[in-house]
Amino acid sequence: MIEASKLKAGMTFETADGKLIRVLEASHHKPGKGNTIMRMKLRDVRTGSTFDTSYRPEEKFEQAIIETVPAQYLYQMDDTAYFMNTETYDQYEIPVVNVEEELKFILENSDVKIQFYGTEVIGVTVPTTVELVVTDTQPSIKGATVTGSGKPATLETGLVVNVPDFIEVGQKLIINTAEGTYVSRA
């Protein structure tokens, strides 16, 4: 059992009614009067629906035991993403709604880890950083300094991140997948 106050983004737990829930965001909130509450943005792993809720910090949940296996992202067709276990060569189909955040960071043939709850495929874990190429951004301005606020850049997966002014189209960048932010040039 795990208390609500210990839940963090990325953790998965099971509710009393058998729903498998993944934490997308979690924060402590202390109202002016009353007790602290945990505000959370959650995703039902099986249906892909997201919802906001709050719990008392002492509420307990059954932590789900998740196993991971190395895999490769193959392709996406319609509403399904296809992955292959790199050890057994088994292929898995995962609804895009369950992995849409992760797909922003991976290209075809990228290495990932598939998450299992028992025999059920429930999601994908991407590396902590990835290298992606800039496909669209405003032109660089001569004399631009690093101290500027930056500019938006669209990457080859469609992800838009804020980058320094000196970044140009065609450059390869290192992106932090946990925060979806620019780290450095590759």
UniProtKB/Swiss-Prot annotation:
Pathway info: Protein biosynthesis; polypeptide chain elongation
Superkingdom field: Bacteria
Gene Ontology molecular function, alphabetical: translation elongation factor activity
Pfam families per record: EFP, EFP_N, Elong-fact-P_C
Membrane-traversing stretches: none
Coiled-coil intervals: none
SUPFAM superfamilies linked to this entry: Nucleic acid-binding proteins, Translation proteins SH3-like domain
GO cellular component term, pick one: cytoplasm
One example of a Gene Ontology biological process annotation: peptide biosynthetic process
Protein localization: Cytoplasm
Keywords for this protein: Cytoplasm, Elongation factor, Protein biosynthesis
Function: Involved in peptide bond synthesis. Stimulates efficient translation and peptide-bond synthesis on native or reconstituted 70S ribosomes in vitro. Probably functions indirectly by altering the affinity of the ribosome for aminoacyl-tRNA, thus increasing their reactivity as acceptors for peptidyl transferase.
PANTHER family assigned to the protein according to its UniProt record, in alphabetical order: ELONGATION FACTOR P, ELONGATION FACTOR P (EF-P) FAMILY PROTEIN
Family, similarity comment: Belongs to the elongation factor P family.
HAMAP family in the cross-refs: EF_P (MF_00141)
Protein known as: Elongation factor P
Organism of derivation: Streptococcus sanguinis (strain SK36)
Encoding gene (name): efp
